[in-house]
Design a protein with these regions (language model features):
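Terminal, contiguous helix-loop blocks that mediate binding/assembly
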Residues: 1-539
Length: 539
């Protein structure tokens, strides 16, 4: 990590997200400016105390106590291939551990390689990971847990305030939270605290939803829809930007150009990796070292200029369809459907469409094109001897794209998306290890001297990506669906009764009030665009 942070070639300032410190041995450390809240039992092999900073509590007691000791310990959690490789740094390190991780990941720490500050990890001790008898399902329960654990003090004052006080002019906060379960309630309470204590700092929230699945029961689907509607209402009011996100659904993988370059996401390890890549690409301008760096507050002002409704959509394409041969023109790569204004090399993670619907009339749009020129340097020359596209040529074509489908503020990044050894290998067989797309016809294959073995999957180590944040009337269907989700009727009243319990319980009037607020936000959008019923329950 230290070697990466000290890189002179990176266009990113890693200290925006990482802090320097010193451990108990006097050695310099790099740890993320991060607080993680998770359930008891979700840490896996991750220790509560980090030996990066101090000896473990058991080690300190062993040195301090001279009397008889009786030791009780549980069986150690077996480490997967990747974590074992970290324990043997001199051993062989594979390009990808995704195959093993995809089968064996149980918690996020199974693919963690970072050291954390002692105040980073915060366990919600009221609930246990994978406890079917005490599930953390409702936002009302999340707010109760926030109060029961006195998180105003134990989380906000002790942990977050410490990171803020040691930071030099922090841009703001990024909050990542499930929008479909109890964590949405914890996030809502946290956001309200931040809005009160740091009103001038940007607060960008990412609401993570599970991919739609036919395996969910009717009750589970109703509960998730209600939770997401309540989260949308709260986050739209308290955040400077709220970005609801859902990974591409297997039910829609048959649509869109992008899907030919990806396999279906099989599990949470894979689909969460896709969402993480989208967020990392879209927010990369926050960390630039040059004059083109974009502050979090500036982005919030661009996408939510009147501070009326912070909800924003995120479209993402990874990998971009950059051909292995130079024979394909750049103009054809970045060509959207002229009639429908759709860029089909991306998936809208908010509107759940297998394309990016571009509104040429809206100024509330920000795009990031990442690593395109770097990836194209690996192209084969054309039959006419043309060499790979230069950075200047790529810049000109991207400028033309933003003019054709603008007004659009865009950022071009040279630094490509590096596919690390723990990142899911959900790429299709036509994607090369350098992130280019192999030709599909036998004629094209023969021209560049390839053979049948080219279809053998190989780890993808880098790729180009595209992300676009946008707001405006395109988001109206999102609010229409939320309004419908909060409509109490005789058919679904049995589900709503679960929300009435506890100190933060909601009755029928509370739901009606939230529904009215969402309806007002919905009406403010005016006429909406037809999005093929993206939000219907049967999709």
């Amino acid at each position: 990590m230290a070697k990466y942070l000290e890189s002179k070639d990176s266009e990113f300032n890693q200290e925006v997200l990482y802090r320097t410190g010193e451990n108990y041995k006097g050695e310099q450390t790099y740890t993320p400016r991060l607080v993680i809240c998770d359930l008891k039992g979700s840490l896996g092999t991750l220790r509560h105390e980090s030996e990066l900073y101090e000896p473990t509590e058991g080690s300190r007691q062993a040195h301090a106590w001279t009397g008889k000791m009786e030791l009780f310990e549980s069986d150690p959690i077996k480490k997967n291939q990747y974590l074992q490789s970290l324990d043997t740094p001199d051993g062989e390190f594979k390009l990808s551990y995704a195959g093993d991780l995809s089968k064996n990941v149980k918690v996020w720490s199974d693919f963690n390689s970072l050291y954390y500050h002692p105040t980073t990890v915060y366990e919600l001790t009221t609930h246990t990971h994978d406890d079917e008898n005490n599930r953390f399902l409702l936002p009302t329960r999340g707010r109760e847990v926030y109060q029961e654990l006195a998180m105003d003090e134990t989380l906000m004052d002790v942990r977050i305030r410490q990171f803020m006080e040691e930071s030099d002019n922090p841009q703001g906060f990024q909050i990542f939270a499930n929008s479909f379960d109890g964590f949405s309630g914890v996030a809502a309470a946290t956001l309200e605290y931040l809005a009160e204590d740091y009103p001038k700092k940007a607060r960008i929230v990412y609401g993570i939803a599970q991919p739609k699945s036919t395996s969910l029961s009717k009750e589970q689907t109703l509960v998730q829809n209600i939770n997401q509607a309540l989260t949308l209402k709260c986050m739209s009011e308290e955040s400077t930007l709220y970005i609801p996100m859902r990974a591409p659904s297997v039910l829609k993988y048959g649509h869109g150009v992008w899907q030919s370059n990806l396999r279906k996401h099989e599990n949470m390890y894979e689909w969460s990796g896709y969402l993480a890549a989208a967020i990392e690409t879209a927010t990369s301008p926050f960390r630039l070292t040059n004059a083109f760096r974009l502050d979090m507050a500036d982005l919030s002002g661009l996408l939510n200029p009147h501070a009326f409704n912070s909800t924003t959509a995120l479209a993402f394409g990874l990998p971009l369809s950059l051909p292995q041969s130079r024979d394909t023109s750049l103009a054809s790569i970045f060509k959207a459907d002229e009639k429908m204004n759709r860029f089909e090399s991306a998936w809208d993670l908010t509107l759940e469409t297998p394309y990016d619907q571009i509104d040429r009339t809206s100024h509330c749009s920000f795009s990031v094109f990442r690593g395109i020129a770097s990836i194209l340097q690996h192209q084969y020359p054309s039959l006419n001897g043309l060499q790979p596209y230069s950075i200047t040529q790529v810049t000109e074509e991207l400028t033309n794209f933003t003019k054709r489908y603008g007004p659009m503020l865009a950022q071009r990044l040279v630094f490509l998306s590096v596919v690390g050894p723990t990142f899911p290998q959900f790429f299709g067989p036509m994607v090369t290890t350098t992130g280019l797309i192999r030709p599909t016809s036998p004629k094209d294959t023969d021209q560049i001297g390839q053979s049948e073995k080219m279809l053998t999957p190989e780890p993808v180590t880098q790729c180009a990506s595209y992300a676009r944040l946008h707001s405006g009337s395109a988001l109206k269907p999102l609010f229409e669906f939320a309004v419908a989700s909060l409509k109490v009727s005789s058919l679904n009243n049995w589900v709503y009764t679960d929300y009435t319990h506890g100190q933060f319980g909601l009755d029928r009037s509370d739901f009606e009030s939230s529904r009215e607020t969402l309806q007002e936000l919905c009406d403010a959008y005016g006429e909406s665009v037809d999005y093929d019923d993206s939000f219907s329950d049967d999709n």
